Amino acid sequence: NSVLLGVGGPKLGAVNWDYLASQHIVCIGAQESGKSTLISTIIAGLTQIGRERARLVVIDHRRSHLGAIDPDMLAGYSASTQETEKLVAVMKITLEERLPSAEVTPQQLKDRSWWTGPDIFLIVDNLDLVADMAFAPLLSVLPHARDVGLHVVITRKSGGCVRALFQPFLAEIKDQSPFIIVLDADKDDG
């Protein structure tokens, strides 16, 4: 249930993302600081998990990962606003079908056994290139991300980050205590 991200910390040990303990990742950094490399690393790690346990929806408006993702793992890929809006609409339908009904028992909630299928990893490289409203349909299911098997991985430039943290989509992710990675950034960016 974890993906190796790299080496770090005071002892230069392995840094892993346990996606069951910390549902989402937010990575902030300056241009050319390694944000897209992090995305590539996460995609490679999730590919090792297999399509039975993980499916990827990749929003990549710079097309940095085009052709680099195993098609078997890919549930959707978008490089434009229109494609992103369509993918998000389909995701919302899938995730709403996974929401627990009133008949779900506490044990089923704990085991997440009222639905079957892989977890969905929404991977957004360069969130600053995507209009926040493109993700508005997901706002109703984001609070239930753990229950419905949704994980969000976001990279964003550091410039304007403080303001962006108050936009609805990123604010909801922030409220769920994501795994935070801060790469090289100008201190004036906040």
What are these regions (language model features)?
Residues 2-107, 112-178:
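P-loop NTPase catalytic phosphate-binding loop
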